[in-house]
Amino acid sequence: MKLLVVTILAGLAVCHGATKEEIVATEYLQNINKELAKHTNVETEVSWAYASNITDENERLRNEISAENAKFLKEVAKDIQKFNWRTYGSADVRRQFKSLSKTGYSALPAEDYAELLEVLSAMESNFAKVRVCDYKNSAKCDLSLDPEIEEIITKSRDPEELKYYWTQFYDKAGTPTRSNFEKYVELNTKSAKLNNFTDGAEVWLDEYEDATFEDQLEAIFEDIKPLYDQVHGYVRYRLNKFYGDEVVSKTGPLPMHLLGNMWAQQWSSIADIVSPFPEKPLVDVSDEMVAQGYTPLKMFQMGDDFFQSMGLKKLPQEFWDKSILEKPDDGRDLVCHASAWDFYLTDDVRIKQCTRVTQDQFFTVHHEMGHIQYFLQYQHQPFVYRTGANPGFHEAVGDVLSLSVSTPKHLERVGLLKNYVSDNEARINQLFLTALDKIVFLPFAFTMDKYRWALFRGQADKSEWNCAFWKLREEYSGIEPPVVRTEKDFDAPAKYHVSADVEYLRYLVSFIIQFQFYKSACITAGEYVPNQTEYPLDNCDIYGSKEAGKLFENMLSLGASKPWPDALEAFNGERTMTGKAIAEYFEPLRVWLEAVAVESLCHQRYKNVDL
């Protein structure tokens, strides 16, 4: 590679015009994109090996290859400084060079880079290896987050049992990482400055190519917050009725251990005790899936069928040969958190997921397969463009399908929902169930990165890092931990993405724009006609719509070759992200909640208001 770079750069000496230099630069890009794909493929392979089997040897190999790639990226950064790329006439060439100029953590000195890899590995390994003792059998101490603890948090209605598992998990998943996390923040900041950014927050926000993006999100969140407050208030009202005043206050934040999720990020698991019309059966096809003999493999085959029905790409054989679709039973430690992987070769795409046969996991399968479809659609692009238009786009694609898959119409289509009676009460129940996932998630997602931005920006004193985290959670989500937390604890890294250095804003963006995508796809498919009750947005199924599939193809095939507003425009003609489609989708629920809040004196805000 070095000889190739030198040869190409030598051509600059004989190029006397900008046009000739740009031709040479274009040739350089063609070659360096191929080299980057090769290097990244090797690094991804060892990362896959480590995430699939956490051993000291796999960690050593991953860190070794990552360090080698960091050196390579530094060489690339030096090479591109020799090109006057900012003056070139081709917007595409300038965009590729700009992308290459961002070296990320590779900008760190070798010793710092090695230390960063060590602390990140330590945090990720700590998270993956958490085991707790059984609440009812202290001699049994092999319960892992996925699936044992998550199933208990989802299904138990015993406040003391839930408090026990919450405390045990947070004490082990978060608190031990504090010193490593402090070093991580330090090195993250150093890397940002070496890349000519002020801090790590600016690095993450730069991916969205808009200096006002943070302000835009704040504005959208404020527009959506009244609906969140309504949902929050109603859930608290119902939980208070179920558990009583001693467990759930009528006026304070919600105890997060009662919300059916370890991080209180989505609350659909407690729908059985908070649904507006409990006499109406909730849409949950988990038991039916088991009765029909569903397997993880069948769930993925059905996801593949959905994409193909829209005229999109079929999963390649490599996917089926190399993916991990169930938790291995050989006792190994692995990262069970569902993830999709691109290996930067033709058709080498994989998913690693400890899949269980449940409705929720069925939707997760479609989410992860959205990433895979994106990988396949842009794999013809140069390496630097083989990513989403922005990080949120990548997360949104599969969620659009999940919105469709979760409708009664689609579940009836595939034979999983039987004897379903559709009326207004059933519709409100279904919308409320969706809100417990989609609306509840928004403030959670925002705080995951607002917290880390504050640390990167130095806005929170190190001696108050844990308190700062819980202040944000209460301010934005109106929740609180089940036990008092102090600076002896450190709880943010108890979320996988925080321990693993994964930017979380992508999920907030995804949960906003997926409704824009969904609305446009539904209109195109003839499944949604605004202001016509026969074709409501919340029961739209885009399965089989080649026309909707073409919208996805138009956008996904661009990869990151265009700014995200261009990609959005290719899908639906819009260039801005808004919360209007969310409001449209949930309007019937908003009207119902507004009425019931008055009738039952169910307040919306979680502070200083009485029922």
Curated annotation (Swiss-Prot):
Family matches, as PROSITE patterns: PEPTIDASE_M2 (PS52011), ZINC_PROTEASE (PS00142)
Annotated catalytic residues: E368 (proton acceptor), H497 (proton donor)
Entry keyword Chaperone: no
Domain Peptidase M2: residue ranges: 19-607
Tree of life domain: Eukaryota
UniProtKB keywords: Carboxypeptidase, Disulfide bond, Glycoprotein, Hydrolase, Metal-binding, Metalloprotease, Protease, Secreted, Signal, Zinc
Location of this chain's protein in the cell: Secreted, Extracellular space
Disulfide-linked positions: C133-C141, C336-C354, C522-C540
Annotated residues for binding of Zn(2+): H367, H371, E395
Gene3D superfamilies in the record: 1.10.1370.30
Catalyzed reactions per annotation: Release of a C-terminal dipeptide, oligopeptide-|-Xaa-Yaa, when Xaa is not Pro, and Yaa is neither Asp nor Glu. Thus, conversion of angiotensin I to angiotensin II, with increase in vasoconstrictor activity, but no action on angiotensin II
Glycosylation site positions: N53, N196, N531
Cofactor binding comment, as recorded: Binds 1 zinc ion per subunit.
GO molecular function, one term: peptidyl-dipeptidase activity
Keyword Magnesium appears in the UniProt entry: no
One Pfam family, short name: Peptidase_M2
Record EC number: 3.4.15.1
One GO BP annotation of this record: proteolysis
Signal peptide (from-to): 1-17
Tissue expression: Expressed in the compound ganglion and in the posterior region of the midgut.
Gene Ontology, cellular component aspect: extracellular space; plasma membrane
PANTHER family: ANGIOTENSIN-CONVERTING ENZYME (PTHR10514), ANGIOTENSIN-CONVERTING ENZYME-RELATED (PTHR10514:SF44)
Family: Belongs to the peptidase M2 family.
UniProt function note: Involved in the specific maturation or degradation of a number of bioactive peptides.
Protein name: Angiotensin-converting enzyme
Phylogenetic placement of the source organism: Eukaryota, Metazoa, Ecdysozoa, Arthropoda, Hexapoda
